[in-house]
């Protein structure tokens, strides 16, 4: 790899041994992927995927202590993934004991480290850092050093930023050094589409199911999606933002997609059209039957397949303000239709602290509370990682949470019926 004189000097120790190790780590990372050079990180803010102080990762926090002691702070302020704990989320005393004494015992230490390393504020913990209410929204063409898969695929695809699917710690090192290896999605060639996906459904496809189908088919490749614009339009509005957020998270978790193009909608597809597609790209046709086949392939790992759900999570990735308002109205309407006043299953909606703050200023916040739904900032997966949570029959509208936990997937319509009518 060819480094600039400044980068080479850091590697040689001009800023101390710790910064030399940071640069060496990035160089080795780039070498592994054939990068020939480093390029500057040009976004205003960074983002780190590690937001939890779990005992098993104590060596990570020890390494962060070394960075802090050496003054190796991030060159850019950053946001972080959601926090793991919220006393308002339903849990029993045994679960709380495991959360606080065994799983997240390092939490206070780690949050203190993030404050020293450069986190924007104590409320900037979310997987949807790119939403306006949070403010970490990169511009088209900006180079990022992020790792959170749902944020990376959104930034690459919907915003046109440039970021690889980095790992945790590597992404923070890129922010500290101010540069990242030049390969993959940072290059023009790496952003070309390897697959053509033709959407031929008879109704608007569930974003979680469509994303899942595409992710499992193309894996880490780049899909160019045709026919979806007839269902979600050709403008990046609030509906499209919510749809693409959930769609992208499913492609990234059910597969390994880091970039997708939606014909007539996402910026590079609008600007370049089919010129983005590689010669000889295979075609994947998705119709109603294919989506049904994909859904029926999901395993259910509950001990009792007919168990009554004990908890419901919606918001993985975190919900948008538009989604919170829309879903509040839908829950209210369904409760009225079923002659109920409050949800029949303990239900948690999750959103970014900044989004929750904005939601609390609307008339919908007290209305949601009146339905019995809990609004939280946590990461549902961090809750589900508790062994006692894994044993619970939990339902979710998130295909990402389904993939990474024992939660059982249902569509949003099904979830709303289940929590307002009851389900067995």
Positions of the model-derived regions?
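Non-transmembrane, aqueous-exposed alpha-helical and coiled segments at domain scale
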Residues: 1-424
């Amino acid at each position: 790899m060819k480094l600039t004189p400044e980068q080479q000097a850091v590697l040689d120790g001009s800023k101390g041994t710790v910064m030399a190790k940071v640069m060496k780590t990035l160089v080795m990372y780039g070498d592994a992927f054939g990068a020939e050079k480093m390029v500057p990180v040009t976004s205003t803010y960074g983002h780190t995927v590690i937001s939890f102080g779990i005992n098993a990762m104590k060596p990570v926090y020890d390494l962060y202590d070394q960075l802090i002691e050496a003054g190796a702070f991030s060159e850019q302020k950053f946001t972080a993934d959601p926090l793991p704990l919220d006393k308002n989320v339903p849990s029993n005393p045994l679960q709380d004991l495991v959360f606080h004494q065994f799983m997240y015992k390092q939490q206070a230490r780690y949050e203190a480290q993030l404050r020293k390393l450069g986190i924007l504020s104590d409320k900037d913990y979310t997987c949807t850092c790119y939403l306006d209410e949070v403010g970490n929204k990169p511009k088209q063409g900006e180079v990022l050093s992020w790792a959170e898969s749902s944020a990376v695929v959104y930034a690459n695809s919907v915003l046109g930023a440039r970021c690889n699917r980095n790992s945790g710690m590597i992404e923070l090192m890129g922010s500290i050094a101010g540069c990242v290896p030049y390969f993959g999605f940072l290059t023009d060639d790496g952003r070309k589409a390897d697959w053509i996906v033709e959407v031929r459904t008879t109704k608007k496809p569930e974003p979680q199911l469509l994303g899942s189908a595409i992710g499992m088919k193309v894996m880490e490749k780049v899909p160019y999606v045709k026919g979806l614009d007839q269902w979600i339009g050709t403008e990046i509005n609030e509906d499209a933002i919510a749809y693409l957020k959930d769609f992208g998270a499913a492609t990234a978790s059910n597969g390994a997609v880091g970039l997708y193009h939606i014909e007539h909608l996402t910026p590079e597809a609008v600007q370049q059209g089919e010129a983005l597609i590689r010669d000889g790209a295979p075609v994947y046709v998705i119709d109603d039957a294919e989506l049904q086949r994909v859904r029926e392939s999901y395993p259910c790992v509950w001990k009792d397949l007919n168990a009554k759900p004990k908890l419901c999570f919606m918001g993985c990735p975190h919900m948008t303000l538009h989604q919170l308002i829309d879903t509040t109205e839908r829950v209210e309407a369904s409760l009225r239709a079923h002659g109920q006043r409050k949800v029949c299953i303990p239900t948690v909606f999750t959103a970014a602290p900044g989004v929750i703050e904005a939601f609390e200023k609307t008339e919908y916040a007290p209305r949601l509370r009146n339905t019995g739904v809990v609004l939280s900032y946590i990461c549902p997966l961090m809750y589900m990682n508790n062994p006692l949570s894994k044993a619970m029959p939990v339902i979710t509208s998130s295909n990402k949470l389904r993939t990474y936990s024992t939660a059982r997937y249902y569509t949003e319509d099904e979830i709303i019926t289940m929590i307002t009518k009851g389900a067995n």
